[in-house]
């Protein structure tokens, strides 16, 4: 979770009830504390899985060596993204070669994300997208969709074990005076 440094102020009435606060409160007077945990999910395309609940992206699918396999990473952007110091999506495939030329980053049901708010770096084992949190306030609370293709290599496992293609999210989850924070 990403913890905010915003102080919670409140006043207690004579009867012990919460009378005033700078935070949202529910109908019983309890303060609703917001912790923003950015979620990341990664799926592979399977045209046989298209239905009203999804767009064909599922947990697993069958492909042949040489196929260009479509992947989709979804990332929920925290409400306080601009306060973070680090927000990085890393993809590390196994027996696949990411085609970074096919990477598209967009807001769910919306426009492409400005290329000025991230840096894409390809390495020998996948890619890294380093977002610039201070420039991302317009994406607060939105879901980003990162779509791309990866070629299934001839070194691929041809068993039911499959070939892993992991994505991770690295972010600062404690904003402190030094600006270093703690990675989550």
Regions found by a protein language model. Name each.
Residues 99-100, 111-117, 178-180:
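Surface-exposed loop/edge segments in extracytoplasmic proteins
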Residues 40, 75, 101-103, 165-169:
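One face of beta-strands
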Residues 48-59:
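Surface-exposed intrinsically disordered loops and tails
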Residues 63-87:
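Short beta-strand elements of extracellular/lumenal beta-sandwich folds
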Residues 3-24, 73, 85, 137-184:
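Serine/threonine-enriched low-complexity regions used as flexible
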Residues 1-6, 62, 110-155:
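Extracellular adhesion/glycan-binding regions together with long Ser/Thr-
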Residues 90-111:
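Solvent-exposed beta-hairpin/edge-strand motifs
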Residues 4-50:
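Primarily secretory-pathway and cell-envelope proteins
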